[in-house]
Curated annotation (Swiss-Prot):
GO cellular component: cytoplasm; ribonucleoprotein complex; ribosome
Source taxon at top rank: Bacteria
Recorded name of the encoding gene: rpsF
Gene3D superfamilies: 3.30.70.60
Database matches in InterPro entries: Ribosomal_bS6, Ribosomal_bS6_sf, Ribosomal_S6_plastid/chlpt, Transl_elong_EF1B/ribsomal_bS6
Role according to the record: Binds together with bS18 to 16S ribosomal RNA.
Keywords: Ribonucleoprotein, Ribosomal protein, RNA-binding, rRNA-binding
GO biological process terms, semicolon-separated: translation
GO MF term set: small ribosomal subunit rRNA binding; structural constituent of ribosome
Name assigned to this protein: Small ribosomal subunit protein bS6
Family affiliation: Belongs to the bacterial ribosomal protein bS6 family.
Protein backbone atom coordinates (compact mmCIF):
# COMPACT_ATOMS: atom_id res chain seq x y z
CA UNK A 1 0.00 0.00 0.00
CA UNK A 2 1.23 3.46 -0.86
CA UNK A 3 1.22 6.17 1.80
CA UNK A 4 -0.20 9.60 1.08
CA UNK A 5 -0.65 12.88 2.91
CA UNK A 6 -3.48 15.28 2.14
CA UNK A 7 -3.45 18.85 3.38
CA UNK A 8 -6.51 20.99 2.84
CA UNK A 9 -7.42 24.50 3.90
CA UNK A 10 -10.93 25.14 5.21
CA UNK A 11 -12.45 28.62 5.17
CA UNK A 12 -11.90 30.29 8.57
CA UNK A 13 -15.45 31.53 9.22
CA UNK A 14 -17.02 28.05 9.21
CA UNK A 15 -18.83 26.96 12.38
CA UNK A 16 -17.22 24.22 14.50
CA UNK A 17 -20.04 21.71 13.90
CA UNK A 18 -19.96 22.32 10.15
CA UNK A 19 -16.17 21.92 10.12
CA UNK A 20 -16.39 18.62 12.00
CA UNK A 21 -19.08 17.40 9.58
CA UNK A 22 -16.92 18.44 6.60
CA UNK A 23 -13.87 16.59 7.96
CA UNK A 24 -15.95 13.49 8.72
CA UNK A 25 -17.48 13.59 5.23
CA UNK A 26 -14.13 13.76 3.47
CA UNK A 27 -12.62 11.08 5.73
CA UNK A 28 -15.55 8.81 4.85
CA UNK A 29 -15.09 9.56 1.12
CA UNK A 30 -11.55 8.21 1.43
CA UNK A 31 -12.52 5.10 3.40
CA UNK A 32 -15.56 4.36 1.20
CA UNK A 33 -13.27 4.27 -1.84
CA UNK A 34 -10.80 1.78 -0.38
CA UNK A 35 -8.26 3.93 1.47
CA UNK A 36 -7.30 3.51 5.12
CA UNK A 37 -7.14 6.76 7.10
CA UNK A 38 -4.18 6.48 9.50
CA UNK A 39 -4.52 9.94 11.03
CA UNK A 40 -6.81 12.92 10.51
CA UNK A 41 -6.09 16.02 12.56
CA UNK A 42 -6.48 19.77 12.64
CA UNK A 43 -3.20 21.55 12.30
CA UNK A 44 -3.91 25.20 13.09
CA UNK A 45 -5.41 28.42 11.84
CA UNK A 46 -2.75 30.15 9.77
CA UNK A 47 -2.36 33.31 7.79
CA UNK A 48 -2.30 32.65 4.05
CA UNK A 49 0.55 33.88 1.86
CA UNK A 50 -2.00 35.52 -0.41
CA UNK A 51 -5.73 36.10 -0.34
CA UNK A 52 -7.90 33.19 -1.49
CA UNK A 53 -11.62 33.86 -2.11
CA UNK A 54 -11.42 37.03 0.05
CA UNK A 55 -9.90 35.12 3.01
CA UNK A 56 -6.55 35.97 4.55
CA UNK A 57 -6.54 33.02 7.01
CA UNK A 58 -7.47 29.37 6.78
CA UNK A 59 -7.94 26.30 8.97
CA UNK A 60 -5.37 23.69 7.96
CA UNK A 61 -6.28 19.99 8.22
CA UNK A 62 -3.90 17.07 7.59
CA UNK A 63 -4.88 13.50 6.66
CA UNK A 64 -2.38 10.62 6.50
CA UNK A 65 -3.65 7.58 4.64
CA UNK A 66 -2.75 4.37 2.87
CA UNK A 67 -4.28 3.37 -0.47
CA UNK A 68 -3.74 0.57 -2.95
CA UNK A 69 -5.00 2.54 -5.96
CA UNK A 70 -5.87 6.11 -6.83
CA UNK A 71 -9.68 5.77 -6.72
CA UNK A 72 -10.03 7.33 -3.27
CA UNK A 73 -7.60 10.13 -4.09
CA UNK A 74 -9.32 10.92 -7.38
CA UNK A 75 -12.72 11.08 -5.69
CA UNK A 76 -11.35 13.30 -2.89
CA UNK A 77 -9.73 15.57 -5.48
CA UNK A 78 -12.93 15.82 -7.53
CA UNK A 79 -15.22 16.58 -4.58
CA UNK A 80 -12.85 19.01 -2.85
CA UNK A 81 -12.70 21.12 -6.02
CA UNK A 82 -16.50 21.39 -5.97
CA UNK A 83 -16.86 22.10 -2.25
CA UNK A 84 -16.92 25.81 -1.38
CA UNK A 85 -15.70 25.27 2.19
CA UNK A 86 -12.31 23.95 1.04
CA UNK A 87 -10.14 26.78 -0.26
CA UNK A 88 -7.17 24.67 -1.42
CA UNK A 89 -5.94 21.09 -1.14
CA UNK A 90 -2.77 19.18 -1.88
CA UNK A 91 -2.17 15.43 -2.17
CA UNK A 92 1.40 14.15 -1.74
CA UNK A 93 2.70 10.58 -2.07
CA UNK A 94 5.11 9.82 0.76
CA UNK A 95 8.27 7.76 0.27
CA UNK A 96 7.90 4.30 1.75
Amino acid sequence: MAKYEILYIIRPNIEEEAKNALVARFDSILTDNGATVVESKDWEKRRLAYEINDFREGLYHIVNLEATDAAALNEFDRLSKINGDILRHMIVKLDA
